Each structure stands twice: as C-alpha cells, then as structure tokens.
C-alpha cells in the first residue's frame, strides 16, 4: 500500500509540473511579438538622426494621452488579445483536471479498504452478544412451560372434595317447607312477585320453578327452591304480569350443600320478605301459623341431619 501511495504521489507531482511548464511555455509563446516590437523600436531609434527623423523622413512615435473616444477604441484591442491568454489557461485546467480526478479515485480506494476491517471487527462482537442472550431467554421460557405442569395436578385435587360432597348427600332424608299464602279473598300478583324474587336473588331454572343458588349471581349449587302452591306448581316468567296464585311454597332438602342452618335462615328471611311485599301470610309445612316454637322445631330437624 505504501508503494502504491508513493507512485500516485509521483504521478500527481509530474502532472502538476507538466501543467506549470505548459503554462510558462504558453506565456513565452506570446512574448516574442512584444519583444520583437521592442527590438525594432531600438533599431529604429539608432537609425534616426539628431532631429528625430529616420532615413524615410518619418519621425519618432510620440505617446499622447488618449481621449475618451480613443480609450473606448483601445479597449476592444485589449479584449481581442484576452482570449489568446485565456485559451491556453483553459487548456491548462483541462489537463490539470484529468490527473486530479485520477488521484482522488485512487486515494478513495485505500480508505474504503481500510474501513472494511473496522466493520468486520465489530461483527464478531455482535455475534457474541447474541450468543450470550440465547440461554438467558431460554431459561424463562422453560419456566413458563413448567408452570402449567405444576398447576395441572392441583385441579383434580380441588375437584375430589366436591365429588365426595356430592356422593355424601345421597337421597333426601327430610324436607323443610314454608308457605306464603294470600289473605282471604285475595291472590298474590305475579307482577309484584317477579321483582321481589329478583331482589332476593332467585333464578328461574329447572322444573320451571325458581331456585336460590350459592352465588347471588345465580351460579353454584341450589340451596332451596320456590314453586307455585297451585298445581302443576310451575311458573311462566314471560306471562308473570297476567299471573296470579293463592300462594307459593319454599322448600329445602336435608342434607344440603353448605351450612344447613345458614341456608334455612336465608329461606326463612326470603319467605318473610315475600309475605311483607305481597301482603301475604307465612305458614309452616302443615299450613299452620308460623310460630317461634315452629322455628325451633325446624332447627332441631336440621341438627338431627348434621
């Protein structure tokens, strides 16, 4: 590379010298005319006599200040000679431009080749960074895949107690019943009954009757249910505004899901609320007046099934 640079420098120096020599030669080429004129003037002066006239009787040329008109006429002479000086100069620039372009091209090439290793030197650094990142990214992926494996075995463990509880209920051993009936000469209106049931979180479902579930949203196991006291004991929620009945019956089977005492308390409070909203009367399972002693009897029946 150093030898190539030296050769290029020598070529550039030779080109510059050639341009300078050509310029001086062009200038010298135009000087003989003036020089000849000057020499002829000197010869003519030697041939002139004491009065200033030559052999032909012509006197010496005198320099007179030029008038504006003469100055204007003299200017074109100068301009006419100007292209003679400009033309060789233009040729000099054309000659100087050719080697200058070549020198620039050759100087750019080593700069490109010198920069190439800089990029290649950075490439392995990037590869090493990616190589170190791969195992770091792989570790959380493995953990994310193992996480569901750890959770999966817990699902049957949660379901097993529910299956055991379902099997433990078996056949109903007792049924707790409450009646809400209308007063004499009146009926319970379906238009008033439906909003009351929705407020108490009842949901229309199986057997075309209303049910109270574990969740207030109407999901989960059924705690107790409510049917129409008049046969066939069903409801039509689409025609509740035209519906009327003598009464409704709330019932809960034992054993039941969850806390039986808590479920009975919810059922009893719901029956009281329906009776108050619709102007009805609360009765026990035998359609007798609901008393405190009747309540204690129901509680004992619940404890007997515990």
UniProtKB/Swiss-Prot annotation:
SMART domains linked to this entry: ZipA_C (SM00771)
One GO term of the biological process aspect: division septum assembly
Record-annotated membrane-spanning stretches: 7-27
Function: Essential cell division protein that stabilizes the FtsZ protofilaments by cross-linking them and that serves as a cytoplasmic membrane anchor for the Z ring. Also required for the recruitment to the septal ring of downstream cell division proteins.
Periplasmic topological domain: 1-6
Protein name stated in the entry: Cell division protein ZipA
Organism of provenance: Shewanella halifaxensis (strain HAW-EB4)
Similarity field: Belongs to the ZipA family.
This protein's UniProt keywords: Cell cycle, Cell division, Cell inner membrane, Cell membrane, Membrane, Transmembrane, Transmembrane helix
